[in-house]
Swiss-Prot record:
One of its GO terms (cellular component) is plasma membrane. It is a multi-pass membrane protein. PANTHER family: NA(+)_H(+) ANTIPORTER NHAA, SODIUM ION/PROTON ANTIPORTER NHAA-RELATED. GO terms for biological process: regulation of pH. This is Na(+)/H(+) antiporter NhaA. GO terms for molecular function: sodium:proton antiporter activity. Na(+)/H(+) antiporter that extrudes sodium in exchange for external protons. It holds the Pfam family Na_H_antiport_1. The chain crosses the membrane at residues 14-34, 59-79, 95-115, 125-145, 155-175, 177-197, 204-224, 258-278, 292-312, 328-348, 362-382. NCBIfam families: NhaA (TIGR00773), PRK09560.1 (NF007111), PRK09561.1 (NF007112). Belongs to the NhaA Na(+)/H(+) (TC 2.A.33) antiporter family. It is found in: Cell inner membrane.
């Protein structure tokens, strides 16, 4: 189990470095002579037609709705694996990170809402600071991998996975457009076929690719966000086949490097480019970016740590062996690294088809500022709290 986690951490750490490079390249492109070409390239229309059926969207939307759906297949498989036989497979294992994740979602959302309570045009962005970027957070942990306890890494993984579940629920409930009943019926049929394939332990991945593609296209047309199709597909991949095959593990092993080294960096490059033209200190400290930044920097650590501490004091959960509350707080600060998921939710919050570019730019700047500070402070705290054995608190 520990060996699998170590391999996963190494992969995610390398992916985190690529994410950072992609984000920096995006900022350079958006604020240089290449700026017109960068934004024009992302708005290039790409159409796919099959008889009467067609999807015609800008390249940016293909990346956000299409490639990110593949990433969410991986998320779905990771969540399923952890629920069935991993760090969330029992009440005792799941309850401590569950309290952490709930606090890390509720408090940032409340801080954002409080700061933007008098600005109705910004209020739909309340979910932006709720997210944690697992690749970046694990990348920071990997820099100190030799001195960070394995239990602490497992805690962060479990917390991030529950955080992903929360993000999936939020996307499903709050970011759906006008619904198409025909598309929903087709999607429902595709889901039933996937569930049947799972029940009969069909292990041929090509079958899931075909039905999954139909599900993705119908969900896209239905008004529900298309990435949710990815989660459903991931959940329907069997953990084991009739003859002992491991289709979920095999597909996870195949998709993980593609997501870490291609899809997420491409998403970062496409979404992190923010033009700083016309930006001022007054704009950067306006309610929208301020709410996001403080939600990530204050809301995340306060929410994660306080919910963990209170749960332990109330006897509802136990502090995992080998870690202490100082280390939990360091991890809580790292949870303020919201980058990819926060940027993704910002795009959903402020419109995909006809977004307000000024609002999107301000929200992305708030995310980048909050993420950067959380990464630096989290690294310092984690290094300080894990540089020598500490007596467990609690």
């Amino acid at each position: 189990m520990i060996e699998k986690i170590q391999k996963f951490l190494k992969l995610e750490a390398a992916g985190g470095i690529l994410l950072l490079i992609a984000a920096l390249l995006a900022m350079l492109c958006a604020n240089s002579v290449f700026s017109p070409y960068y934004f024009e390239f992302l708005q290039t229309q790409v159409a796919v037609k099959l008889g009467a059926f067609s999807i015609d969207k800008p390249l940016l939307m293909w990346i956000n709705d299409g490639f990110m759906a593949v990433f969410f297949i991986l998320v779905g498989m990771e969540v399923k694996r952890e629920l069935l036989e991993g760090s969330l497979s029992s009440y005792q294992k799941a309850i401590f990170p569950a309290f952490a994740a709930i606090g890390g979602m509720v408090v940032p959302a409340l801080i954002y809402w409080f700061i933007n309570r008098d600005y109705p045009e910004y209020q739909q962005g309340w979910a932006i600071p709720m997210a944690t970027d697992i690749a970046f957070a694990l990348g920071i942990v990997a820099l100190l991998s030799k001195q960070v306890p394995a239990t602490l890494k497992v805690f962060l993984l479990a917390l991030a996975i529950i955080d992903d579940i929360g993000a999936i629920i939020v996307i499903a409930l709050f970011f759906s457009n006008e619904l198409s009943m025909l598309a929903l019926i087709i999607a429902s049929i595709a889901i039933m076929i996937l569930i049947t394939m799972n029940r009969y332990k069909v292990t041929g991945i090509i079958h899931y690719v075909i039905v999954g593609t139909i599900l993705w296209a119908s969900v896209l047309k239905s008004g529900v966000h298309a990435t949710l199709a990815g989660v459903i597909i991931g959940f329907c991949i069997p953990l084991r086949g009739k003859k002992g095959e491991t289709p979920l593990h095999d597909l996870e092993h195949t998709l993980a490097p593609w997501c870490a080294f291609a899809i997420l960096p491409l998403f970062a490059f496409s979404n992190a480019g923010v033009s700083l033209a016309g930006m001022s200190l007054a704009k950067l400290t306006s309610p929208l970016p301020l709410g996001i930044t403080l939600g990530l920097l204050i809301g995340k650590p306060v929410g994660v740590f306080s919910f963990c501490y209170l749960a332990v004091r109330a006897g509802l959960a136990k502090l995992p062996e080998g870690i202490n509350f100082k280390q939990v707080f360091a991890i809580a600060v790292l949870c303020g690294i919201g980058f990819t998921m926060s940027v993704f939710i910002a795009g959903l919050s402020f419109g995909e088809e006809h977004p307000d570019e000024t609002i999107l730019a301000l929200s992305r700047l708030g995310i980048l500022i909050g993420t950067s500070i959380a990464a630096i402070v989290g690294y310092i705290l984690l290094k300080k709290t894990t540089n020598k054995p500490l007596v467990q608190a609690g």
